[in-house]
Amino acid sequence: MTIRLYDTSARQIRDFTPLLPGCVSIYLCGATVQAAPHIGHIRSGLNFDIMRRWFEYRGYDVTFIRNVTDIDDKIIAKSADHGRPWWAIGYENERAFNDGYDVLGCLPPTYEPRATGHITEMVEMMRTLIERGHAYEADGNVYFDVRSFPEYLQLSNQELDNLLQPSGEGETGKRDPRDFAMWKAAKPGEPTWETPWGRGRPGWHLECSAMAHKYLGSAFDIHGGGLDLIFPHHENEIAQAKAFGDEFARYWVHNAWVTMSGEKMSKSLGNSVLVSEMVKQWRPIVLRYYLGTPHYRSMIEYSEEALREAESAFARIEGFVQRVVEKAGGVVEPSPEVPPAFAEAMDDDLGVPQALAIVHTTVRQGNSALAADDKEAAVARLAEVRAMLGVLGLDPLDPQWAGEGDRGEDLHGVVDTLVRMVLDQREAARARKDWATADAIRDQLNQSGLVIEDSPQGPRWTLGPR
């Protein structure tokens, strides 16, 4: 079946046809590194990580670009407020973002370009746009003339004359208030670079147009980002790139937000939850399940209850995996192919919720096989489950999740040794028919957050939902 994606520019789901057979090129608007990431920031990277994994499963060679905006009004403002170099703030938060992507199992991008490393490409794009009458210089600033580009606002389906005029932000010399800055003239205390129009720094929109062209050429398959980027950022990217002569992106894919009390999670609103804090409270694989399993175009309303539900749901999957591994006496390799129903769901606009339902159905079938002592059927179901979880980045047997944190594997071994000692005491009590003591030990372990299951191979323990 052909992969189908919702294309924002077409406002409908379209069959995906790659520019080059067997290859997929993706540009994802990455982090503006003025602060450490909250889970809303990371959701976008995680959604497109699942997209990438699915294309790779389907046999495509994927080139995945995720940029870093390391110079920006907010970074400069924070530099002034905190008395720290702008580049130090950017680098510190870039590392925090990469830590967030890594801890939640996102594959590294093919390239991760920084805006400040591509000033030459930006200057060349501005020079061409000025020569073609699409941009102009005024008081050291370079603006894009939106009326020179008739296709402007087609992505967001707006009319230019109905567009609210921006407040201005101190910009001077504009021909039209809706023209946007490609280059900002130097101001005291700000970082600057030399250009034919004087020293200054790049505008946000120019950065992405130039970097997409540098790494993916004049045309590429998919441009991604959050819904909030459709206007003005992606509209302005399109205007610059197409006026420059690029075909630019052929599909536009946007993910929905994480919300809190119905509002988009945002540091400025004070309703954000940092990834670094979340992983202290929740296992990273549970966070990935929580953020990655809703459909990418559906909002996620943040709540502790929803996280606990995700934890319980994943525990059912993980428990099945552990039981079959014990039954099989070793690791069961994933199937080379996922079940057809799972593939059909993923091909249909990355239908992760429907695909996940197939995972849970297969887990139930596997549990029934275990209950019937049908080892062969249980192993076959686990192989299918591992194949599906691998596509979603949720296979608990993947080395990515071994330990889940600093020294996690060592810690698990220590805890296992201690719990086994207690379970041995419980087994001794059961052998003496001292049921009261055996039950008391089990209850104490349960109160500690452990689930004890008695099996023909002896007792085993797992972490229970909180």
UniProtKB/Swiss-Prot annotation:
One of its GO terms (molecular function) is ATP binding. A motif ('KMSKS' region) lies at residues 264-268. One of its GO terms (cellular component) is cytosol. The keyword Aminoacyl-tRNA synthetase applies. Binds 1 zinc ion per subunit. Its cofactor is Zn(2+). It comes from the Bacteria. This is Cysteine--tRNA ligase. The lineage of its organism: Bacteria, Bacillati, Actinomycetota, Actinomycetes, Kitasatosporales.
